[in-house]
């Protein structure tokens, strides 16, 4: 099990401004595709997506495992401490959309079923990314191809939504072409699932 303390105050303060800029272009794209009134961001860091959503009238919550993320949260009342490796049902499909960006590859394979069960319990629509083999990154311990995640979600009755994934990917690529900073891995790692 890796040490969550690598995600300290320094890590989150260095990423805060970029996270807010990311939210400014990514969240309107999501809203345009999914028209959500409620959202949960799983592995939300300091809650920049939650913050944007709440500023725009969305009932938004965040789940975060690193205490420094919560302590530096933009929405301290709405970001809850949560270990994604421990089975704990918080809400059962209570949200219009569950968002899980840059998290899946950080969950050790022995805990993946708990992680996926948690995601599937939160919403009937899930937008996530997952790093493929070879991407590498801080504390990446479970890089898997998309087919791995698609199979796990299918076992729980969630289908891979090719149309929405393509539309979202095109929107991200358009944002990049328009000058917004987009991590090079981001468009390729996107997946949308629907039950």
Question: Where in the sequence are the language-model features?
Answer:
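Conserved N-terminal segment of class I S-adenosyl-L-methionine
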Residues: 1-101, 110-122, 133-136, 142-148, ...
């Amino acid at each position: 099990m890796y040490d969550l303390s690598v995600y300290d105050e320094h890590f989150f303060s260095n990423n805060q401004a970029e996270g807010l800029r990311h939210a400014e272009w990514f969240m309107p794209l999501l809203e345009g595709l999914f028209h959500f009134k409620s959202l949960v961001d799983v592995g939300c860091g300091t809650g920049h997506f939650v913050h944007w959503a709440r500023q725009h009238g969305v009932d938004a919550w965040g789940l975060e495992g690193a205490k420094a993320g919560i302590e530096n949260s933009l929405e301290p009342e709405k970001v809850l401490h949560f270990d994604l490796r421990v089975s704990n049902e918080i809400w059962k499909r209570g949200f219009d959309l569950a968002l899980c960006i840059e998290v899946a590859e950080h969950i050790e394979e022995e805990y993946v079923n708990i992680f996926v069960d948690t995601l599937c319990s939160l919403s009937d629509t899930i937008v996530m990314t997952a790093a493929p083999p070879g991407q590498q990154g801080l504390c990446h311990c479970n890089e898997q191809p998309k087919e791995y995640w698609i199979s796990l979600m299918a076992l729980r009755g969630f289908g891979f939504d090719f149309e929405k994934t393509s539309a979202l990917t095109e929107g991200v690529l358009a944002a990049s072409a328009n000058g917004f900073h987009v991590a090079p891995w981001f468009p390729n790692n996107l997946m949308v699932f629907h039950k």
